[in-house]
Structure formats: C-alpha cells, structure tokens
Amino acid sequence: AAPSEIDFRLGKIEHTRFPDGENYYRLLEAREIRNSPAVYVAGTVSDAAVMEMYNICSALVMEQCSSLHIVIPYFGYSTMERASRRGEVVIAKNIARLLSSLPTSARGNFVYMVDLHSLGTQYYFEGSIRPIHLTAEPLIRQMIADVGENPVLATADMGRAKWVQKMSGRLGLDSAYIMKQRLSGEQTEVVALNANVSGRRVVIYY
C-alpha cells in the first residue's frame, strides 16, 4: 500500500555518492520525526543496501522516532541461513545481528519479513528488536487467480517445495517441482521436472 493509503507521510532522503564511493545521507524531514513512528521499507538485495538500511535507521532513532519499523519485503541472502561446509559465512545471520545492534527507539524496534526462505532466519535477531514474519499468501492467491483457469503452481527452489505443495492443495491446483543443479555461482542446470506442464500456464514461486 502507498503511504497515502495507510495514513503515513512519505519522507524524503537526500543521498549523494562521492567519487571515492562514500555516501552522504540527510533526512530532509528530521524535525517531523520526533515522537512519531518511523517506517523504513527496503530489501537486503546487496551489501550496499544493507548498510544503507543500517545508516538510515540509525538516523531515524537518533532523531527520536517513537518506534522504528523496518519492512523487508525481500530478505536477500536468505538461502545462506546456515553453513553446510566448514568456513562458510552465514550472511543471513550476520544481517540479523547487524540490525539487532541498531540503537533502540523509545517504543522499540520491529523488523517485518515476508515469506522467508527459512523460518529459522527470524530467530537470528538478538536483544530487544522484535522480528515479525508475514505472509503474502492472500496477494499470491489473487495473482494466481488472475493468471487464468487451472494453472500449475511450480517452484525451482526445493526450499519452497512444501509451501507450494500446501498452496496448490488449498487451491486445488497441480504442482510441479523443477530439480536443478548449481554449476557455479551464476549458472544452474535443470536436471528434472516431475510434472507435465505442456500447453498450460505455470506460476513459478521462488
């Protein structure tokens, strides 16, 4: 929903990037922040985005917002929520720890995540910050309905297989699983498909 639909005013942030790569940020409505709840919406789509989130949210608390609400529609690195080999860095956990270290607003800090790849990610947050896991299932249901009659609900991510199976069961749809093999950090190969989707509309859920 847009800020106007939920009775929030959209704040403005001045951002300048210097030739050496350093960033300058300024909250242009700083005077309006004090004693008001602040909502920051962003995804952890890159390391730069994570640091930007941390810097701006820190500034919101320093300007004395009454409560801080971080909304993360897409939690990047969510497939790196545990180490499968010795020496691997669990980046999802480190992001959670970083956000947990934010200064705390008077009425607390909250982080909202949507359909996490692994539900365990929310338990990496520490201290007083409160993680809240949400689902976009109602929106996804509507999007599937708009596709047309009797589509196939599929996933190429085996971490989503159970979710897709449950959703397709509730909607009375067929499901499909695309088995893939990762060849490198940038290349994957499809090795199997467990359903016949020829001539049918397919909704792929990641």
Language-model-detected regions and their locations in the chain:
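PRPP-associated nucleotide enzymes
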Residues: 1-206
